[in-house]
Amino acid sequence: MSRPDWDEYFLGIATAAAQRSDCERSKVGAVVVKDRRVRGTGYNGAPAGAAGCSTCPRRLSGAVPGVSDYSSGATRCVAVHAEANALLYCDREDLIGATLYVTREPCYACSNLIAASGIERVVYPKES
């Protein structure tokens, strides 16, 4: 039996974090790691205190996950991405020179946040 390398290990933690998401379209997890220690985790979902996927207007309108336009009107998705949540719950000191592990390739907006955060390296599965 072989042990996973550090990247595999922390991607596994990101995968576990993704399971907390109640998004019916895509479950994404992220982990901030510095000096081989977890500094923060995040998963995609509605902001704290807001309606999650099961009660959001987008779902109640009959929008089909992965098919409907999620960018406007009653079907606008309010979810905060996993990467953003992980970054928001870290101290700035924890981000400088850290690695971000994500269960899929970050979107354009998250890539900009990551670039501005001080994260030095981003790891995600090749098949994402």
Swiss-Prot record:
Gene3D superfamilies: Cytidine Deaminase, domain 2. InterPro entries: APOBEC/CMP_deaminase_Zn-bd, CMP_dCMP_dom, Cytidine_deaminase-like, dCMP_deaminase, dCMP_deaminase-rel. Keywords: Hydrolase, Metal-binding, Nucleotide biosynthesis, Zinc. GO terms for biological process: cytidine deamination; nucleotide biosynthetic process; pyrimidine nucleotide metabolic process. Residues 5-128 form the CMP/dCMP-type deaminase domain. Its EC number is 3.5.4.12. The active site is at E83 (proton donor). It catalyses: dCMP + H2O + H(+) = dUMP + NH4(+). Pfam families: dCMP_cyt_deam_1. The keyword Calcium does not apply. The keyword Hydrolase applies. SUPFAM superfamilies: Cytidine deaminase-like. Zn(2+) binds at H81, C107, C110. GO terms for molecular function: dCMP deaminase activity; zinc ion binding. Belongs to the cytidine and deoxycytidylate deaminase family. This is Deoxycytidylate deaminase. It comes from Mycobacterium phage D29. The lineage of its organism: Viruses, Duplodnaviria, Heunggongvirae, Uroviricota, Caudoviricetes. The gene is 36.1.
